[in-house]
Amino acid sequence: MNPLLAPPYSGTLPFNSMDLSLQSARSAAQPLAKQPPNQQPHQTQQQQQSLIHAPNYPSIQNLTTNATPTSTQLQQQQQQEHLAAMAAAHVSLLQSSRQNQGAPSGNLSNGGDCESLLPPPPPTSVSGNTNHTGSNSSSNSGSNNHIASPHYMQSRDENFKLTQLKRSFEPDLSGKNPQKEKDFGYPSASSASKLPTHNVQQQHANKKPSPLRNYHQQQQPPYNLTPKYNGPQTPPTPQSPLAANPHQMLSPTMDYNQLHLHHQLNSSSGGSYQHMQQDQTQSQSHPQHLHYHNQHATSQTAPPPLLPPLLTSGQFHAQPQDASQQQTASSSQHQTHHSRTAQLTNLDQAVKHKPESEEQPVITDLSYRNSETDKTAANPVPEAPESPYLTTSNEESLESNSNSSNSRKRRKRKASMVMRVTPNENAPEGENSKPQHPQQAANLNNSCSPKKSPKNGGGEFQPFSTQKQSQTENEKTTQENGRGGSPAPAENNSNSNSSTLYNDNENPKTKKQRQALLQRNLTEQHRMQQDDEPPKNHTSPAMPPPSPQSNSSSSSSSSSSANTHSSQSSHAVNNIPKPEINNKATTDTPASPALVEQGDIDAKPAVSVHECDEEEEPAVNKVSPAHPDPPTTAAVAAPPATESPKKSSPAANSESCPFGEVEDKLEQMFAGIEEETERISSPEKPAEESAAMVAHNLTAQLALDPSKTLDTPAENQTSVLAVLAPNQTPTPEIRPVATKAAMKSTMPSPVHSPIPQSRSTSTPLVAGDDSKSNTPVPAKAPAPRRPPPRRLSMGMDASLLRFMIDDPPAKKPGRKKKVTKEPDFEDDDKPSTSAAAAAALAARQLSEAASATKSKPAAGAKKKNAGVKGKKGSAGKGNAKNAKQNGKKSARKPAFTTDEDSTPAPTNGGGSVPELRFKSPFILIKPDGSVSIKNTHSAEDVNEKQTKVKKAPHERKNLRGMHSSTLSNRYDADTTDSTWICVFCKRGPHKLGLGDLFGPYLVTSDCDEYRAAVQTPGAQDIDGMFVNKRRREDMVKGQERNLPAVPATLANIMQAPKISMHKRKRKQTHDSSISYSDDPNESRSQCSSVDLLDCSTESKFVETFRGMGKTSENGFEVWLHEDCAVWSNDIHLIGAHVNGLDAAVWDSTRYQCVLCQQTGASICCFQRCCKAAAHVPCGRSANWSLSEEDRKVYCHLHRHEPGVVEPIKTESIAPVEVSVATPPAPAPPPAFNIHSLP
């Protein structure tokens, strides 16, 4: 396992090696409680390795540990030293990791090296404080991760990758000389080995009596000063904890991480540690984070001592806003969770000594969780958070450095950091609200430590698990952690951090038990992450992180943090939003940073921790109830064992292949450690601890399979995480920064939460990987990067999310695969080309062999394992890498935009075709793991719409009415259109009491009436030529429809007021019998058609078409008054249709009104021989007789002539002309008149 660990660390991203170291730390640290001093040193070395991951935060850890600004300065110096020390310690840790597997003595020697690196603390206080310092580093780092995750975490995640690489390189390059740099001035960060030693000692001390822990917490500020002076090399400090074997025995369940977390809480604040920790630890952790951030930014140069604790806190708070989200996250965490800040500090050391420290924190977490009585386990919680924060800090600095491997790691971390950043923003609400929340924050930060763990391997995972467990204990000791930090330091530590963790770790004192508990915590954390991720939607208001999730690396962090928030909001929606619940709020915020650090795993454990804080162990269970379905799925996946459910938590979190593969690789990386962890893991571990550990520690996750019995409760949490997994789907994208451990726990959860069995498969794979090699973990770590988490944030609320899965288990695994792909491509591509790649390949092959059976239940998970391993295994696996990159990065990130579909074209085949037919937007998860969002209709639907038969083009479709009726809203009564007139009377609407104009009606010129109107019997040819020539060319202007067919010569007349025009024409009519007629002999009764056809008068033709609008070649638009239409001869109403309009219109054009001299006369006198024709309004104004009873019309000359009336009655058919011709013979019978008719 150490060989695997070493290649990933050196060749792969520092996070890979750290993961391996973390795994080693887990293996060694869990037995720490049970092992004799020799084993304890071995554990210490492993813890140191875990802390080597934490060293990403070591400077922050030391700063947090050192309460005073002086200690901050010293810590800064130590940070620089710690970078070197971490490198040296890491080298020794890698060796010791192998030795740990091989022999405890080797581990001891490695632990001794680390111890030499650690700053000297007072013997008992020093041992406790040193461990506490380590715990503070991890706790503060983790807490800061949670609190600062919104900003600090984001920067730090990316930098953390680079920083971890840096650290991995530095340890290799610097040997043990860099140990000073490794110790960022934090007591436990003095050296990776020292921190692990402290962790071991702290395990003893913390486990031994909560008072010791409390004492360390109380003395943390002084002790912080102690590490200041000799941070890098203080063998006594590690040995004090080692010497504190009785403590370890007293609190055997407390893992090193737990001790770290607990101690940090105790040391940071002492008696008033909770409140002081808020102030001092917050400031300290800010300095730590600041130092760490600056150190990373400046490589080895630690920033000048940060401001005093409070000032530093503010400064750190400001920084995240500027360039480092990790600082903001740190400040938030410090503000909200001072204990968390301390934890973050511990995590820093844990990061430095990531392999052992990380593992130890997880073990401590397990111990804490198992033994609720052990309240000294608070320290381990702080340690775990520190590790995540260190990761963030290192990532940030690495981000600045932009090393290739570190860059990838940084991206992962950054993505995780983004996740954490968002939760931290939420968390600071709760954390700042309660000073004791900070301790819980520390616990939660321990949970965050897994974020580191993903980079380290399992170490950071374990701190996160520890943190979560610690927070679970915090829940149990909510009173102390929530409010009474200062009164009972021991109580505070054990209650807030240790208590929960020890409850998780209750009975397992052996390394195996501890590892099993750690794995359970990891699973729990995984579940919490998944819970957090879906609650992320719940907590969306408090979580802007979904948008960060959108970013590749930032997305991972955001997704993780969102997951943390989501899970917390799911089961304890108020946890994040509610600072009211100290533990709750604390957990949520730390979880966020953890998520940022580790990816989804961190966030999920934070959720578990959150619930643990709220309800302690019940809280974890609460997480499971919050997502009952996922628990069920976890149970389904639990078949392997409780441990499998535990792993299932990470696997369930990423029910898809990508996560499963990540898990498998992680398991391979941490195979040896996981085996130890599995042995240590015992059913005693509460479910929440197991869940916390799953999320907390990749090692714990890997050990999940062995600790399946313990995972039954954890399985519930895993289920919860799985339920949140759909929301977590975006998390993988954000998790990219997360390490393989983070990837393992975080990446799969979003996709696979829906598919518990897939998770279960993933879990067995994890177990297989566990026994094989640590390299696979790096492959998993990239998974936290997969876009799905961001996709979920971007796309929709997890609760509203619709997943279309052809083969849910297969598709989920496929998703897993995708999740793994992207992270692998980003973070693990380069590692696969290094010595670590060879180790990873070997581990991958072993893992594949071992997990083949387990993978079969979830083909998707196995696919993911294969892809991730291939990418991780070797550069030769370029195809696998590219496939992952395209499928995971291209498909997973674009999955939100359905770009993913294009990448996994093969995956579209299965159930995508039928699923595409769904009308509403949905997420399509294909068996190959490709995930895409479908929000458009299928091609068939589009074609159907396009092929809809268009309405047959109506004759008037393109026509526009020239005029608007007065009934229309568009009618303008003030400026009426002079051309809008009745076709008969040539008057506008409402003239002479005629009312509104009706229309428009269309009349055609293709009729006999038109031809008759334009032609006269004697001049057909001439009239035809004239009409065709004049009307069509000049007057009508053929193609201008919508315009009145009136020549320009009449424009002035048509525009003139109608009444005045009519009056003028009437005068003309009276003066000359026919104004428009050139024939002076033409009588008034003569048909006006003659005048119209007079070639000499153009105005006659103009008047013919007056009131008409040319709409087409043969079509005219006409409007008419009701009375004009009623009195017309040819118009009649049949049903709702007006018939005979064409004939009436064209016939009217043949007759000119005798009163107004305009065409369109529709009534004529019934008197015989009287040809007078007039418009209805004109006739009425001229006192014509219009009888509506018999529809008889007489002009004003004949209305009083009884003879005329009589004959008209008798001879209604006879024209007026005839009647007038025979007035002297009224007596003759009607027949006479009939005969006399023309």
Swiss-Prot record:
Keywords: Metal-binding, Phosphoprotein, Zinc, Zinc-finger. The modification Phosphothreonine is found at residue 642. The keyword Zinc applies. The modification Phosphoserine is found at residues 453, 682, 749, 753, 793, 799, 1099. Residues 22-83, 96-150, 169-250, 264-694, 739-915, 936-955, 1057-1089 are annotated as: Disordered. A zinc finger (C2HC pre-PHD-type) spans 1089-1131. One of its GO terms (molecular function) is zinc ion binding. Residues 523-536, 678-688, 937-947 have a biased composition (Basic and acidic residues). Residues 861-874 have a biased composition (Basic residues). Residues 35-49, 73-83, 125-145, 272-287, 309-334, 393-406, 549-570, 632-641, 832-860 have a biased composition (Low complexity). Residues 58-72, 96-110, 188-204, 433-450, 463-472, 755-764, 1071-1089 have a biased composition (Polar residues). This is Uncharacterized protein CG5098.
